[in-house]
C-alpha cells in the first residue's frame, strides 16, 4: 500500500543556512544539510518571493489565446499561455484575473483551477497554479512598451498539438493544456466549457 503524503516524515536536517544572494523576486540559499542522518553536504536552492500563475482563456469559438514574446534568458521568441506572477501570500485567482486582463484585455465570467505544479522541485520552491477561464468579455489590452506582446487565437486542439510539439514553451501552459485535454476526454468539465472545447 502506498504511503500517503501526510504519513511521510521529513528526512532532511538543516545544519546551517546562508543567504548567498537576495533580490526582490528570490533568494539563493546555500545550506548544509543531512539526509536521513547521513553525511553533511551542501545544498543550494532558489527560494521564490513571487509565484507564477497560468490563465488559459477559451473564447466563444473554443479557441485559446496565446501570447508571444522574445525571452531574454532563453534568447528566443516563444508562444505561451497567458500568465504572470505576484508576491507569495496574494490570492492566485486574483493574480490570474489581473494577468489575463493585462495580457489579452479579456475578463472571464467563469474560472476553474486545473492544477498546481512544481516548476523544478529539486532546486526551486516555485509552485505555479493554473486556471482555465471562459465566458470571456473582450476588450483592448493595455500594451506595455516595456513588455511588447504578440497575440494569436488558435483552436484548442491545435494548441494541445503545439504543446506536444514544443511550439508552446512555458511549462505551466503546457501542463494546463494537457490537463484540460485529459479532463475533456474523461468528461470531467462543466458542460458549457466542454461544449466550447468541442467546437474547435
Segments and roles (model prediction):
Residues 50-83:
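A glycine-rich, hydrophobic loop/mini-helix early in the fold
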